[in-house]
């Protein structure tokens, strides 16, 4: 499951996974951000903050995640991955080959630094 908040005045989406990601998470996320992107052209930033990656509930959740990324990565300027997870720390280096957005990793306790970077 994931929680999210769209900071409309800043154009920044905050995402906090707290359990295995579900297919419905990405439908809810798209329902929230798609109208904003349609009105504003893009998101200035996306912050993903989690102590560790919770995985996916099912194969359909994994497919929904990849589809969401494919449909939205060109519409997000920057992505901050805020985590101490060793697995997620390498995400920016891997995703850089597949995602148009600029990606940077921050330690879990550096949420404010990540938000400041997204606002640049």
Regions found by a protein language model. Name each.
Residues 1-120:
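Amphipathic, Lys/Arg-enriched alpha-helical "gate/interface" segment within cytosolic domains
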């Amino acid at each position: 499951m994931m929680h999210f908040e769209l900071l409309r005045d800043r154009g920044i989406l905050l995402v906090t996974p707290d359990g295995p990601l579900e297919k419905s998470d990405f439908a809810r996320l798209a329902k929230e951000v798609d109208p904003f992107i349609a009105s504003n052209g893009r998101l200035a930033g996306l912050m993903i903050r989690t102590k560790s990656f919770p995985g996916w509930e099912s194969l359909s959740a994994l497919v929904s995640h990849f589809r969401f990324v494919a449909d939205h990565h060109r519409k997000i300027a920057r992505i901050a991955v805020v985590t101490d997870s060793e697995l997620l720390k390498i995400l920016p280096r891997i995703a850089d080959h597949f995602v148009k957005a600029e990606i940077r990793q921050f330690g879990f306790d550096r949420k404010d630094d990540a938000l400041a970077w997204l606002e640049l």
